[in-house]
Amino acid sequence: MEKDDPPQLVTPTSVKAIILRIEAAQLTRAQEDISTQLSDILDNVNCVINRFQEELGYDLKENAKSQQRDPKGKKRFILLEKIASFSKDAMMKEKHLYDILRWLGDWGDTLTYEIGPRKSEEEAAALDEWIEVTEKVLPLSLIATKRGIESLTALCSTLIEGQKKRSQVSKRTFWQGWQGRSPQTSPSHPQPLSPEQMLQDQHTMNTKASEVTSMLQELLDSTMFSKGEVRAIRYMATVVENLNKALILQHKENRSLETKYRHLQMQATKELSSQRLHFQQFMEVLESRRDALLKQVEILGGRYHDLLLMKQALEFQLKKAQNATGQAEDLAEVSVDSPGPSERETLPRKETVMEESQQEPMKEEQLFSPLPPSPMAMIRDSGAIAAGHQPLSTMTVRSRVADVFGSKDTESLEPVLLPLVDRRFPKKWERPVAESLGHKDKDQEDYFQKGGLQIKFHCSKQLSLESSRQVTSESQEEPWEEEFGREMRRQLWLEEEEMWQQRQKKWALLEQEHQEKLRQWNLEDLAREQQRRWVQLEKEQESPRREPEQLGEDVERRIFTPTSRWRDLEKAELSLVPAPSRTQSAHQSRRPHLPMSPSTQQPALGKQRPMSSVEFTYRPRTRRVPTKPKKSASFPVTGTSIRRLTWPSLQISPANIKKKVYHMDMEAQRKNLQLLSEESELRLPHYLRSKALELTTTTMELGALRLQYLCHKYIFYRRLQSLRQEAINHVQIMKETEASYKAQNLYIFLENIDRLQSLRLQAWTDKQKGLEEKHRECLSSMVTMFPKLQLEWNVHLNIPEVTSPKPKKCKLPAASPRHIRPSGPTYKQPFLSRHRACVPLQMARQQGKQMEAVWKTEVASSSYAIEKKTPASLPRDQLRGHPDIPRLLTLDV
């Protein structure tokens, strides 16, 4: 087959004209682009030169003139750059022209194919029409292409110009002022301040912070950073400013703490100095007392020595008399059993000597005893002892004391007790002690002189037994007055010692309160740490399960808690339970007490009744309605009678308290509160109104606290049960993966959970019981107080109703009306039927059973006891003032 010659490409004149126009347009466009770029570069260079001239303060053109050492090299470099740019542009233009030529060749092929031999006139007409359309559309498409190319070139030129500007902008030297302030001799930069220097010197820290902020502001003022970088620099500047402010606040707080510390130190030093001075004075007093006692012991020793000498002399005289008469044996027997009339002269002598020898240790015992025996007590003791069989010496001494107090001279001893009432502490410690010592010495000298006279008098044989008794009674009168004087001084010393003991007890109580607070804070930290661990455990358990082996290791490492740790937690939980202590008793005077009924405020006259379960044991701090200070009910107020102020004591047995349970809905409490808040309409005294208002507000707050405790208890219970269920699931997974040996730790963990649950739930139960007791006492106080207000002051307040914890089955309506009693003392509901009145009791019992069922359910089952629904026809005030949904909200709040 003969090969056909390829068709020759024939370019029409119109196409050639279009190509020429395109080339001319491209040349003009390239020239314009080059001129615009050169002008932009020149403008940018001028702008940079002007900016640096403004900032640096000198002209760059002068430096350029001085630095024009090699202008030819610079011109050559610029020329080479221009030639390279022109060559790049020429290559790009050649490439573009080649693409256009190829595109035009394709168009020529299509046009030659279309211009081929025409078959018919219709095809020729269609072809002509297509050519006309192409002639119209082609310039438009070329124009659109030109515009697109122009927009692309403009966009690329802006990007290229920005890049060129960034590359052409010379690197700016920042922080010249900071560098100028730094010493030029040191090669390194200035070192920043250490944290200790910042805390010590506030002025230096402020200057350094201002320097850093000014440096960051200089960065912000420059235009060489992008928006993101500027935002980051601004963030750093704000952080530095905030740190500076925080340090300033810390400085202020440190100064305030230093001033407080100095003030407390001064107070402590003053207190210690005063205590030291007081202790020194007290020691001086004790030393003076010791010296006085030592002196008294010396005097008594000398007297005892004299008495021994007198005893020997008397024995010698007695032996001499016995030898003279020759009847020594008979006289000895008679003197032991019953003295005869011949020996009555010698016996009083021995009796007086023995009496005085025994009175001295008795006086010593009285001096060192805390409270001396009264004269009447000594008379009774002397009478009782003299009646029995005792030795001769003791009988004689007691009989003489009885004779002394039985005589008429005892009337002179009774007024001595009167000055004991005036017990005031002396301002100076030395004067009373010196006076007391002087009086002691004088009294002892008088007493010893009189004792010596008495002994000499009894040694003589001229007086009878009656005269000797009279002399001894007169000589004993003044020592008793001395004893009373000493007793007065001893009472003063005892009172001073009691005062110091009270102060020491007070300091011990304050120290114990501080220790209790520290222990409570430690327990709170421990509870927070345990709660944080529980939250971390829950988060870890919510994460996707890992492989069995890794899961067992994680359980051993995270879930397992040693038994010792749980024992510590048990102790902490037991310590968190409120128990009566000395700190609580000390704080009871400062805590606001709940109002109590008049029966609890007034004790009985005989025996004080024991504390019942209704009385408060622990009184939490509660919010109250602001009222004026109350007046005591025991003091009469002007304008009121005493009969209205004194309330009769209400004696309630524990059996009656257990049987009666009072209830009052929130609507009635709100009505009472509204009625009591209206002062103008009520004519109650202020103390009665404040007491009733306090009872009402306390009852409402206790209801809210009961609901809060119940919700907290239930939340804690559900959390522990969910944690327990998760542990059980882990145990099952380990059993399935045949890793049961690793489940032992989880079993220990489950035991610890059960132990902790029992402890915490018991603590919450105790709190709930305490609130219930307070609530019952408030309601019983209302039942006691409100009817009396209604009777005496005509104030009609809603009274709590009496409900039975174990109500009997409701009888039919045909029952006799005598079995139906009113629910309150003065509150009656005659419009309700008997059957309908028994329904709330059944509902209350059913709701209590349902709550017990809720607490006894397991998490896995989540089933509740099925009970009979509450009929919808009952009003809400019969259902304790609230609907039956949800079951948890069974409290009247």
Swiss-Prot record:
Biased composition (Basic and acidic residues): 342-353
Residue ranges the record marks as coiled coil: 303-331
Gene: FAM186B
CC annotations in GO: protein-containing complex
Any single Pfam family the record assigns to this protein: FAM186A-B_N
Compositional bias of kind Polar residues: 179-188, 197-207
Keyword annotations of the record: Coiled coil
Superkingdom, taxonomy of origin: Eukaryota
Xref: PANTHER family: GLUTENIN, HIGH MOLECULAR WEIGHT SUBUNIT PW212-RELATED PROTEIN, PROTEIN FAM186B
Lineage: Eukaryota, Metazoa, Chordata, Craniata, Vertebrata
Regions that span the bilayer: none
Protein name: Protein FAM186B
Family as reported in the entry's similarity comment: Belongs to the FAM186 family.
Signal peptide: none
Origin species: Homo sapiens
Database matches in InterPro entries: FAM186A_B_C, FAM186A_B_N
Disordered, as annotated region: 177-207, 327-376, 537-557, 574-611, 806-827
